Amino acid sequence: MVESGPHSINDDLSTNEYIEQPKFYHDDHASDSNSLSDIDDDNKKHGGLYGTVSRTTTRELPEDLESEISSTHSQDAKEDLEIQHNAAPYSLLNYRDKWCMVALLTACGFWSSLGSPIYYPALKQLEKQFDIDENMVNITVVVYLLFQGLAPTCSGGLADKFGRRPVLLIGMLIYVVASIGLACAPSYGVIVFLRCVQSIGISPSIAISSGVVGDFTVKSERGTFVGATSGFVLLGQAFGSLIGAALAAAWDWRAIFWFLTIGCGASFAICFALLPETKRSIVGNLSIRPKNPLNIAPVTLLPAARRKLKYDNPDYETLDKTKPVFDLTSAFKICALPEIFLSLLPPGLAFAMWTLMLSAISSELSAAPYNYKLTIIGVCYLPAGIGGLIGSFATGKIIDFQYKKKLKVFEEKKAAGIIPEDEKFNIMGARLQSVLPQNFLCVVTYILFGWSCDKGWKIPSILITSCVSSFCAMSTLSAMSTLLVDLYPGKSSTASSCFNFMRCSLSAILMGCFAKMKHSLTVGGTFTLLAGLVFVGNFLMFIPMKHGMRWREEREQRAALKAKSMDQANENGYKLFSKIKFSSPFKSEEKV
């Protein structure tokens, strides 16, 4: 809620939540602030890294210098410059600490992505034990994916309002309890119900993890850390079937859920002790101790941690002054914006096909002409896991490189007068451009995978196409998560849940229809049809790349005009009201 004049209005969800911040300049580089490359050179000279604490200085920007810096840098460039050279650093976490946070977030979210594919190799065992057909057993997969898309849209708002830590930990606890119930489930109906509960508990962790990374990174490094976090978290989806096949072959399907119980329980204990609260409206740059005990990690009570986080000298200026408003429909409103919807639909469909591919590996390799055992099928998932791992590491670096390159060209053109001074940097174009090559490449690999399974081609064709497809899927996820955090830094968990909702909803639809489509079109025909939809959909992404930022600016202007007119109307109403003279309704009775 933003206070404006005599009344309050809600921010339009299509715009970022802006708050008035102190203006800064850095005294060591004021003379050469026209070049971003000079800042990069200084970074290298000092051995510094974005987000480190050691080399930053800050002073208030005098009014006579404000216009000079404003005219030489875009908003994105100024943001990174101010953050990098600010005496109150954007985050007290150094480079090593940030990677430790990535490891903790992976421990949280890994079990969400693992919960679905670890189950695939055991589907045949469930069919036999409960005497159900393929369509019914697929329902247990579909409901998990469905709630994996829906639950984060609500939990993301809770995390943006009450903090990341309590929502993550409560979700993990629900997941552990549901996994115990699944391991002991006596009937098919109980399995379906507890799969819903299991998904509701753990699925928000993926979106919230992106929000946590957005809390302690700036745009110039965000791609690396969001990409790594998203990629590591979703490695469970790539390696899950390998683990599930080993467990089901050694024991039975119940061993899978005991494994999830033990693994997530251990991760819960680690995260409970070590994971700090990062929501900037609660802890700022981590120098402010949370008031709510649920937001306090035990490790931060140690003297060494207190000194590192500077609890004795908190910097309240780093607090996000925007008051988050919990809205259950917030994620859906963001997702419905044209530039967001057009950006998310093609990658979401491509990612849903990846989920379908992982399921198809198990079902197709267990049938003729392959007739592989569970252990061999599990090994066949290894290339998909390796491809996803490479995609996670490589894409983050590519995204950051693309961002810096585009921003540098933009700054040079602005300095040369080629583009207007008031034009904003097109961050949507920079981020989406890094997605398109992978999205077009996966069209080819999905078609080849489908026909490899359909015609019984040699197994290397299936392994290679699954590896490349996994690389593309992880690349797409990293780029889209980074873009959403960039566009909505104040509610990054809610924004990240939009892509989660899109990809999981489409995955649930495809999984629900796969058996019938395979029967009607064959595996090759099904993957060819869906890959064609991805190919056509990819061209939709060119629309937000070109017009997305303009649409957002137009909505900002309309929102500003609406706020101004409401202010004026309220002011006129107040003046009119003050001129009205009221007589008392109570009159003394006349004496008779």
Swiss-Prot record:
The keyword rRNA processing does not apply. This is Multidrug transporter AQR1. PANTHER family: MAJOR FACILITATOR SUPERFAMILY, QUINIDINE RESISTANCE PROTEIN 1-RELATED. It is a multi-pass membrane protein. InterPro entries: MFS, MFS_dom, MFS_trans_sf, Sugar_transporter_CS. It is found in: Cell membrane. GO terms for biological process: amino acid export across plasma membrane; cellular response to acetate; xenobiotic detoxification by transmembrane export across the plasma membrane. It holds the Pfam family MFS_1. Keywords: Cell membrane, Glycoprotein, Membrane, Transmembrane, Transmembrane helix, Transport. Coiled coil: none annotated. The chain crosses the membrane at residues 99-119, 139-159, 166-186, 188-208, 231-251, 255-275, 340-360, 374-394, 432-452, 459-479, 497-517, 523-543. SUPFAM superfamilies: MFS general substrate transporter (SSF103473). One of its GO terms (cellular component) is cytoplasmic vesicle.
